[in-house]
Amino acid sequence: ESANQVTIITEQKDNAVPIETRYKRISTIEKAGAICSLLEVRLITGRPHQIRAHLSSIGHPILGDRKYGNKKSLEISKALNIPYQLLSACSVTFPEMKGTFGYLSGKEFIIHQIYEFIHSVFVK
C-alpha cells in the first residue's frame, strides 16, 4: 500500500508543502496489551492523508492503517479485529465563507452514531 503515500519532513525543501495539525488526547485505554488513545484532531491545513501521515510520523499510527501503520500497530489491529483504519469524523465544521458555499458558513454537523460508538469504547 505504498502508492499515493505522503512523507512528513521536518526541514523545509523546495517542493514541500507545510502542514499544521492540532490534536488533544480525550482518553486512553488498554486493549490487546497496548495503550490506545482517542484523539480530537483539528486540521489547520487540509492536505491528503495529513492526519494519518502526521500521527504516524510522530510514532502514533492509527490502528488499522495499512498504509501508514507500523508493525506494532498492525499487530494490535489484527488482535482487535480492526480490518480498516480507525479514523472517522464525528463532526464537520465549516469556516466563515461567502459565495457558492456561503449557506454552510459557520455550520457544524455532528455524526451522532459514530460519536456514540467511539465514546462507548473510550469514554466510560
What are these regions (language model features)?
Residues 1-124:
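RNA pseudouridine synthases
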